[in-house]
């Protein structure tokens, strides 16, 4: 396999593709689409951005859950009551629900 040549002349970098897209948009008049398809593509891009934001929020929630668990263990080690630890768990759940509601709106 070491003797096999790879033709890299056909490979296009992401930067080149982005520049090509910008040139095409300038030539075609991105702001004034001839048909509704161009507008739908723009909306599709916006939906993808929202999806990426939702993924980020989910990752943050996972990190927060890990930190909250450590706090509960510290209280138990200090001699805190089981009732207090249960109240803390309820607080963590309350913190998560508003975040989910914000992303749904």
From Swiss-Prot:
Subcellular compartments: Nucleus
GO cellular component, one term: nucleus
Compositional bias (Basic and acidic residues): 1-30
GO molecular function: histone binding
InterPro entries: Pro/parathymosin
Residue segments, region Disordered: 1-105
Pfam families per UniProt: Prothymosin
Tissue note: At the 20-somite stage (18 hpf), expressed on the dorsal side of the embryo in the developing central and peripheral nervous system (CNS and PNS), in the tail bud and the pronephric ducts. In the PNS, expressed in the otic vesicle, trigeminal ganglion and the anterior lateral line placode. Localized throughout the hindbrain, with highest expression in rhombomeres 3 and 4. In the head, expressed in the olfactory placode and in the diencephalic region.
Listed Acidic residues bias regions: 39-78, 87-96
GO BP, one annotated term: negative regulation of apoptotic process
Predominant location category: nucleus
Keywords per UniProt: Nucleus
UniProt-listed PANTHER family: PROTHYMOSIN ALPHA (PTHR22745:SF0)
Family affiliation: Belongs to the pro/parathymosin family.
Protein name listed in UniProt: Prothymosin alpha-A
Taxonomic source organism: Danio rerio (Zebrafish)
Originating gene: ptmaa
